[in-house]
Regions:
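Conserved acetyl-CoA-binding loop-helix of GNAT-fold acetyltransferases
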Residues: 53-59, 174-190, 208-213
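Conserved catalytic-core motifs of GNAT/GCN5-like acyltransferases
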Residues: 82-94, 199, 217-231
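Conserved hydrophobic beta-strand within the GNAT/NAT acetyltransferase core sheet
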Residues: 163, 196-200
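Conserved active-site alpha-helix within GNAT-family acetyltransferase domains
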Residues: 76-81, 179, 202-220, 228
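N-terminal charged segments
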Residues: 1-77
Length: 241
């Protein structure tokens, strides 16, 4: 007889844990499926083992023909869903990093979003949208008045906060700005009694080396997946009615 399943950790499904926890005020819900507003974050919270009803709810929430990001999902998408993006990723957690404030770092807010979007467009650290800054603290470094590096907070499972949007203008790379900002953001997270974590692509060896040098350790491999919603998704709730 099979024993009990091991208890799931909140970092195993961090988007769902965020949207049912500290970020619940952002959540748009249909059934057991949750999402952030489209101008805040693309991430969706899908149950660990979604059934046909969950996929139907996901389709209704996202819309036919639209792309559904399913970061961390390890299962198989249903027939008819077109996988549009699928790469290996890693999740790293604080393992004694030397978190510290940075004298040059400044708090970024809504008035800085145009510059933040421009920096993200030029450096491609991952999704950053007009209201992503509302998810937590974002810090930046300016040179000559221009924003040249930034990092901030994204997913927020209970007790944990993800560091994201870590990027540096190509002209200012090699000065250690990204590492300094990661440590500064981590300091704020630690001050709240929470633990920093982050994600990156498994092939992004430079970023992984940087994070490990700062004191992060690999917790698990993961998957960055997206699938296109088909035009029609059966809803199991209506079968036999």
């Amino acid at each position: 007889m099979a024993g009990p399943r091991p208890e799931r950790h909140v970092l195993d499904n961090p988007a769902l844990a965020s949207l049912t926890g500290p970020h619940a005020h952002f959540a748009e819900r249909r059934g057991r499926v949750l999402r952030y507003p489209v101008d805040v974050s693309p991430w969706l919270g899908l149950p660990d083992e979604p059934d046909a009803d969950d996929w139907a709810d996901l389709a209704a929430l996202v819309g036919p023909g639209e792309e559904a990001p399913l970061a961390g999902f390890r299962g198989r998408v249903p027939d008819g869903w077109e996988v549009t993006f699928d790469i290996a990723g890693v999740q790293l957690v604080d393992n004694g990093i030397a978190a510290a404030p940075d004298a040059e770092a400044v708090r970024l807010g809504p008035e800085d979003v145009p510059e933040m979007l421009d920096l993200v467009e030029r450096t491609r650290p991952g999704p950053f949208l007009p209201r992503t800054v509302e998810l937590g603290t974002y810090l930046g470094i300016r040179r000559g008045g221009a924003l040249v590096a930034m990092a901030g907070e994204r997913l927020h499972p209970p007790g944990w906060t993800e560091i994201s949007a870590v990027c540096t203008d190509p002209e200012f790379r090699g000065e250690g700005l990204a590492g300094r900002l990661v440590l500064a953001v981590a300091h704020g997270i630690r001050e709240r009694g929470e633990t920093p974590f982050l994600h990156t692509g498994a092939g992004n060896t430079n970023a992984i080396r940087l994070y490990e040098a700062l004191g992060f350790r690999l917790r698990r491999t993961t998957r960055f997946l997206a699938a296109r919603v088909p035009e029609h998704v059966p809803d199991g709730r209506h079968v036999g009615v």
